[in-house]
Regions:
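Terminal catalytic/cofactor-binding subdomain
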Residues: 1-121, 152-165, 205, 218, ...
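Internal, well-ordered domain-core segments that constitute the primary functional module
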Residues: 109, 115-223
């Protein structure tokens, strides 16, 4: 398939929190039941027959779905995680992501436990101090110089994009020294005990914060880190085969959160793809570096006056809106007019920055934190509550309920108060159909054929290839390729055998 210069592969992984009535047993057991129903009853995917990780992803903990995505239970039953298919189009990504939520909701309803079980794409546990990741993946040039130098020009964008990408949060957390940091052997011997950063660092409520832009800003303690269980970072240098091919590899962004608003979700991913490209092309000035990225991250998130000032390495102070405008100008000057998707990103990036500069609170149709703040303020006013009341955390949480019949966000959306990118029909279609222009297409077709062959004793799916028996392996190294021919060839051989 011809590849245009502006093509970029991207995908998102979302960890879900689950609350269940005690009568159903543990949340872990409920999560297992949801996963089993999706694979064994609805047959929406091929369950793993092999362990991908002996501790965190044993055999049968999940698998690849017909829509090209992957659903699994991470960290030995702790939570459901959904990784979208590889996508090139923002609308495909939004639809594929929402389709995963609908699959989970469908399983809950058909099992008959919708009154007892709630699943959330909330990125923080207000009371336990845990966080749930929403990690972004981008195909980038495999260049060590990017990690050594380019990330310094990337951090200012990542730190300040929360002004339009943040989902909002009631309250805040303070990380303390907490329990003693475990030694390496202790972690090896007891890996499951150290899933949560709160087992290494103490987490306490911050009484001085009423509302902030980001759910995860308080929990980020490194700019870049490979051992992410102890070092919540902006970036995880996961140079591996997930999207790797032809001089390109995977960039794994850890600092993100689960947008309910489709517009905010797409703008977050879209602007990030353009900034990555500008960095690869050497267009971002070397002096565009923050003095202290992590301090700026928290200060922007907690600024109740919406000035969002950050300090650059050279001592200049600049607003986050103006800093974002600098990235916008770089990308617009270089890439405007090359395709409809790029122009959509650029025009809406500019529009949202204009709105943030004029009156942020008018942007509730496009920005999650604004919509959530309005809901919380309305509830607080009606009930006569102050900001310390735990009921406000419940409003925050229910904004992220993935069931459209329960979610405060979806109620807002059903009233026509949000800017949508996809239709409900698009989402339903994406529950079974993969993106048509990436390798997810070929992998999806192989999942379908494995499911059609009852009693298949052996298969092994991965992002970059599929083993159909112990003698054959279909390689899928290029994420841009649909891989139609290998699929067709296996179809013929399987019919003949």
């Amino acid at each position: 398939m011809p590849r245009e210069t502006y093509d970029r592969i991207f995908g998102v992984e979302t960890e879900f929190g689950t609350l269940a009535e005690e009568t159903l047993g543990t949340p872990e057991g409920v999560v297992e039941a949801i996963k089993d129903y999706l694979f064994y009853e609805l047959k929406l995917g091929a369950i793993d027959l092999h362990a991908r990780d002996d501790v965190f992803e044993p055999a049968a903990s999940g698998g690849f779905l017909m829509n090209g995505a992957r659903l699994y239970i991470d960290a030995v039953g702790s939570h459901l995680e959904y990784a979208t298919a590889e996508c090139r189009q923002l609308k495909d990504l939004v639809a594929n992501d929402r389709a995963g939520q609908r699959q989970i909701v469908r399983a809950i309803k058909e099992i008959g436990v919708e009154d007892e079980v709630n699943v959330y794409n909330n990125s923080v546990d207000h009371f336990g101090g845990h966080t749930f990741g929403c990690h972004e993946n981008y195909l980038v040039r495999a260049d060590d110089d990017f990690l050594n130098n380019g990330v310094n020009q990337f951090y200012p964008f990542l730190v300040t994009r929360q002004i339009f990408a943040g989902v909002g949060r009631v309250g805040g957390h303070v990380l303390t020294n907490g329990p003693a940091r475990p030694n390496y052997q202790e972690v090896l011997d007891n890996p499951v005990d150290y899933i949560w950063v709160s087992n290494v660092y103490g987490v306490e409520p911050d009484p001085y914060v009423q509302f902030q832009l980001s759910q995860r800003a308080d929990h980020i303690i490194k700019t870049i880190a490979s051992r992410v269980r102890f070092n919540r970072a902006l970036i995880n240098p996961k140079w591996e085969h997930f999207y790797s091919h032809d001089g390109m590899t995977r960039l794994h962004l850890l600092f993100g959160e689960s947008n309910q608003n489709e517009f905010a979700y797409a703008l977050k991913i879209g602007t990030t793809t353009l900034v990555i490209r500008a960095l690869e092309d050497g267009l971002v000035p070397e002096e565009m570096v923050l003095w202290q990225p992590l301090i700026a991250l928290r200060e922007v998130s907690r600024d109740a006056d919406y000035r969002w000032l950050v300090t650059m390495l050279d001592g200049r102070t600049i607003s986050s809106v103006d800093l974002q405008r600098q990235y916008l100008k770089i990308c617009a000057d270089a890439y405007r007019g090359e395709c409809a998707q790029t122009d959509w990103i650029l025009s809406n990036w500019e529009s949202i920055l204009d709105g943030l500069e004029t009156d942020p609170l008018t942007l509730g149709d496009r920005i999650d934190w604004v919509a959530k703040l309005k809901m919380v303020e309305e509830y607080r006013s009606e009930e006569g509550l102050d900001w310390t009341d735990d009921a406000l955390h419940s409003v925050d949480l229910e904004y992220h309920n993935i069931d459209p019949d329960k979610s405060l966000f979806h109620a807002y959306q059903q009233m026509g108060q949000t800017t949508r990118l996809v239709s409900d029909l698009d989402i339903v279609t994406a529950m079974t159909d993969p993106p048509s222009d990436t390798r997810a297409y070929g992998r999806s077709k192989l999942v379908e054929r494995v499911l059609a062959r009852k009693g298949q004793k052996f298969y092994m799916f991965d992002w970059s290839g599929v083993a159909l028996d112990r003698q054959s392996y279909i390689e899928m190294p290029d994420p841009f390729d649909r891989y139609e021919q290998p699929v067709d060839q296996w179809g013929k051989s399987s019919q003949g055998g």
